[in-house]
């Protein structure tokens, strides 16, 4: 690899020789050189960040990709529906398998192909996360999602798999999920035959479920004085901050300005989170029990080598609340939208429910385990409307590596456009059609796993950085959807049809909240 002198040394040497008379000429020459280098870097495939790397480390082969603009590269790809824009750019560059682009000074690769996705997601080289200012400001660098690859992160993963999301803990929380489902049914029953927006009910249910699992605190969905409104605001603020594309993450000269007000908003949110979660930890420590009722109890009972500091516990527990709340609500809203839009599919799910459960009692989680068409519907909605179309949080290479035959240097951000993979006609037959039958027909994908083993549909990620709560999330979504479809028929509102327009925040959600009517089915 060719070595090069620090870019700043020649500037210092040149300016030291300046006099007042020739300073203007020196500045003009320096500006011209800077512009020349800027445009030279930009002229390379992939844009300025890749051009800077290629200048000093000429590769054997260059990854295709758009140049974007000088200095900022392809920052425009990350505006609005980034997964759409990136897929279109990959098609234009004929680089669906692997495309390079620049976000300011950040080198990025992205794939829209399942084979290359598997190569990236299962590679130990891409076990780290890229730096994100909002994640660090919100303490998530000490939680499972954003913690740097190393001993601490491996310890968190072990705690999550052995204690927090183990089958025993998931089974122990079955009753609370059933009680929350019953509360949702009660609220919707009181609004039957009237147009209603279901999003707030789903968000409250998801938040209540996570609060009970994580902190052992139970909330009544219909109680306006339960404190859930204030807690929901904290979660929404964190969700919005992490979902914002922060230009300062990719343009170092903006780091001191906080032009998007992200650092200021994080600094206001963190003390409130610390007080809220810290108080709960203190209460649990003061009244410690023999049984581990919730995640706080589990963390407090860990043996000495695995014990976490209070600040680390706050980060881990807050991330659990944050990650487990909106994703479940967003996905169920998409499922109910599809049920209202496709009544024949809804009827088939309800026929299966009636055959397995009957109408004399409510659905139990054990009932869902023997169903085939309902899980197929959930998989098909995940295929068409993946909550994390770019798998939400990107990967970072910790060493030089080779992906799809191309050299990828250490420090490169990698993305997987799962939205593009899920709509690729070379991967799926009639990819734009809503057909749950593709997962249940003979010779189809009845046993198709969405938990990470098949890159064609891996909404929870795959490999070392897969979502640790995927089994709990899958169980919750299937059970609640079964309960809601068993109790009600879902039809579009008279005022509005079903609008499938999406908006990309941290997750891809419905741009316009679903407005429907519900009709009781069980008397």
Swiss-Prot record:
Keywords: Heme, Iron, Metal-binding, Monooxygenase, Oxidoreductase. SUPFAM superfamilies: Cytochrome P450. It is an enzyme of class 1 (oxidoreductase). The keyword Glycosyltransferase does not apply. It comes from the Eukaryota. Pfam families: p450. Heme binds at residue 467. Its cofactor is heme. InterPro entries: Cyt_P450, Cyt_P450_CS, Cyt_P450_E_grp-I, Cyt_P450_sf, Cytochrome_P450_78A. Its EC number is 1.14.-.-. One of its GO terms (molecular function) is oxidoreductase activity, acting on paired donors, with incorporation or reduction of molecular oxygen. PANTHER family: CYTOCHROME P450 78A3, CYTOCHROME P450 78A7-RELATED. Belongs to the cytochrome P450 family. This is Cytochrome P450 78A3. The lineage of its organism: Eukaryota, Viridiplantae, Streptophyta, Embryophyta, Tracheophyta.
């Amino acid at each position: 690899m060719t070595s090069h002198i620090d870019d700043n040394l020649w500037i210092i040497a040149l300016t030291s020789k300046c006099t007042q008379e020739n300073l203007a000429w020196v500045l003009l020459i320096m500006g011209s050189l800077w512009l020349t280098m800027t445009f030279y870097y930009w002229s390379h495939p992939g844009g300025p960040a890749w051009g800077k790397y290629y200048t000093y480390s000429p590769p054997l082969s260059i990854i295709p990709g758009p140049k974007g603009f000088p200095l900022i590269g392809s920052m425009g790809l990350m505006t609005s529906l980034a997964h759409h824009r990136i897929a279109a750019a990959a098609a234009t560059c004929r680089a669906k398998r692997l495309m390079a682009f620049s976000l300011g000074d950040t080198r990025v690769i992205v794939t829209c192909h399942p084979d290359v996705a598997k190569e990236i997601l299962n590679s130990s080289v891409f076990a780290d996360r890229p730096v994100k200012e909002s994640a660090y400001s919100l303490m998530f660098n000490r939680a499972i999602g954003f913690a740097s690859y190393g001993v601490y992160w491996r310890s968190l993963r072990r705690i999550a798999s052995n204690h927090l999301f183990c089958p025993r803990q998931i089974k122990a929380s079955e009753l609370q999920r059933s009680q929350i489902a019953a509360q949702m049914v009660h609220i919707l029953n009181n609004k039957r035959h009237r147009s209603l927006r279901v999003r707030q009910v789903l968000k409250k249910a998801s938040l209540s479920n996570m609060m009970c699992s994580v902190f052992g605190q139970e909330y009544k969905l219909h109680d306006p004085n339960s404190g859930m409104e204030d807690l929901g605001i904290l979660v929404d603020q964190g969700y919005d901050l992490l979902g914002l594309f922060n230009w300062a993450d990719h343009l170092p000269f903006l780091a001191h300005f906080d032009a998007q007000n992200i650092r200021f908003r994080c600094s206001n949110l963190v003390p409130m989170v610390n007080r809220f979660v810290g108080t709960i930890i203190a209460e649990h420590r003061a009244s410690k029990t023999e049984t581990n009722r919730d995640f706080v109890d589990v963390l407090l009972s860990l043996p000495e080598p695995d014990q976490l500091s209070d600040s680390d516990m706050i980060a881990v527990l807050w991330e659990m609340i944050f990650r487990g709340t909106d994703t479940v609500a967003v996905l169920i809203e998409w499922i109910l939208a599809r049920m209202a839009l496709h009544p024949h599919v809804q009827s088939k799910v309800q026929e299966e429910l009636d055959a397995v459960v009957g109408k004399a009692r409510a659905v139990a989680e054990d009932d869902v385990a023997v169903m085939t068409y309902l899980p197929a519907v959930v998989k098909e909605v995940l295929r068409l409307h993946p909550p994390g179309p770019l798998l939400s949080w990107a990967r970072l290479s910790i060493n030089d590596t080779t992906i799809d035959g191309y050299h990828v240097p250490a420090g490169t951000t990698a993305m997987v456009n799962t939205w593009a993979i899920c709509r690729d006609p070379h991967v799926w037959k009639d990819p734009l059609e809503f057909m749950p039958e593709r997962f249940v027909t003979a010779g189809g994908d009845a046993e198709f796993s969405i938990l990470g083993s098949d890159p064609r549909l891996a909404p929870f990620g795959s490999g070392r950085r897969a979502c640790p709560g995927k089994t709990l999330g899958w169980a919750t979504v299937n059970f609640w959807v079964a309960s809601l479809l068993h109790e009600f028929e879902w039809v579009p509102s008279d005022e509005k049809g079903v609008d499938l327009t999406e908006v990309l925040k941290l997750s891809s959600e419905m741009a316009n909240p679903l407005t429907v009517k519900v009709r009781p089915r069980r008397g």
